Design a protein with these regions (language model features):
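Membrane-embedded helix boundary and interhelical linker motif in transport proteins
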Residues: 6, 28-75, 79, 255
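Helix-loop-helix "hairpin" substructures at the membrane interface of multi-pass membrane proteins
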Residues: 129, 133-211, 235-241
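Short, non-helical or kinked segments that cap or interrupt transmembrane helices
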Residues: 22-44, 58, 86-91, 161-164, ...
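Hydrophobic alpha-helical transmembrane segments of polytopic membrane proteins
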Residues: 17, 69, 222-245, 267-275, ...
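Transmembrane helix-bundle core of multi-pass membrane transporters
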Residues: 84-158, 185, 251, 256, ...
Length: 289
């Protein structure tokens, strides 16, 4: 049981990184960026090529992949979402799905649909701590995820750009009147969320030693569930939701329900939307018409 708890926390930390990207973008512009899971996939492939082709150090490759996916996020926002800023929500939603398919099948065209083995960039060392067995890779994934979450919280709460993000999320028109560059703030939000997704992609590709162009579909959807579960638009809620989903999946597998673990996650989404639509940490607010 303790082993499953540890495994669930490690998986949940990656879901939390992904969910944070969803929740930040939604908090700023009320958009569900369904291409977010594919940014995670792009991060994994960028890390793969940097390590495999250039023999780059894993941690350097991780940082470069984060920078590259941050730029990708800004480009997607500028080309796909910014022109639709004042369009209907359904138009933006369809565009997000279109961007998702473009990234997925663009990569299928470029690299093929086959699953690739991620380079063994870090020598695995196993530690047996009583009933719990851990590897250095698992500990590293958990540590990096927690560090990135703490850094995100510091950026949002303590920096000038973080204050701008919070102002835009409350009222973008008022923020603009106060001299805040709304477009730059939204681009920065996409960059942050995409960088976290890129990091998650590299970490998971290393952990499972595999990657393929459609690897972001299921984790992307589950991370969306995590964001809704915790309270979409709320950063601590997204992190909490990620850990809860990771634990649910792990314990479902441990109790012999691995075939139903996806159904359990999506069932949680339906349940939370019926019982508490605002999420665990969210507050029910009536939308003004």
């Amino acid at each position: 049981m303790l082993q499953q708890l540890v495994n669930g926390l490690i998986l949940g930390s990656v879901y939390a990184l992904l969910a944070l990207g969803y929740t930040m973008v939604y908090g700023i512009i009320k958009l569900i960026n369904f291409a977010h899971g594919d940014t995670y996939m792009m991060g994994a492939f960028i890390g793969y090529f940097l390590i495999n082709s250039f023999q780059m150090n894993f941690f350097v490759a991780l940082i470069v992949a984060m920078l590259a996916t941050a730029i990708l996020g800004v480009v997607i926002e500028f080309l796909a979402y910014r022109p639709l800023r004042h369009s209907t929500r359904i138009a933006v939603l369809i565009t997000a799905i279109g961007v998702s398919f473009l990234l997925e099948y663009g990569m299928v065209y470029l690299v093929g649909a086959n699953t690739r083995a991620f380079p063994q960039a870090i020598q695995t060392v196993r530690y047996d701590l009583g009933p719990v067995s851990l590897t250095n890779v698992q500990l590293m994934i958990l540590a990096i995820s927690l560090i990135l979450m703490i850094l995100l919280q510091v950026i949002v709460q303590k920096t000038k750009m973080g204050k701008a993000m919070r102002a835009v999320s409350v009222d973008s028109d008022a923020a603009q009147l106060m001299g805040i560059n709304v477009n730059r703030t939204i681009s920065f939000t996409f960059a942050l969320g995409s960088a976290l997704a890129g990091a998650a992609g590299v970490l998971i590709a290393l952990y499972y030693n595999s990657l393929e162009p459609l690897m972001g579909v299921t984790p992307g959807l589950k991370s969306f569930v995590a964001a809704v579960l915790g309270g979409i638009g709320i950063i601590p809620g997204a992190a909490l939701g990620g850990f809860v989903i990771g634990l649910l999946e792990t314990f479902a597998t441990a109790f012999g329900m691995s075939d139903f673990r996806d159904a359990i996650v999506y069932g949680i989404l339906l349940l939370i939307l019926i019982v508490r639509p605002a999420g665990i940490l969210g507050k029910n607010v009536k939308e003004k018409v």
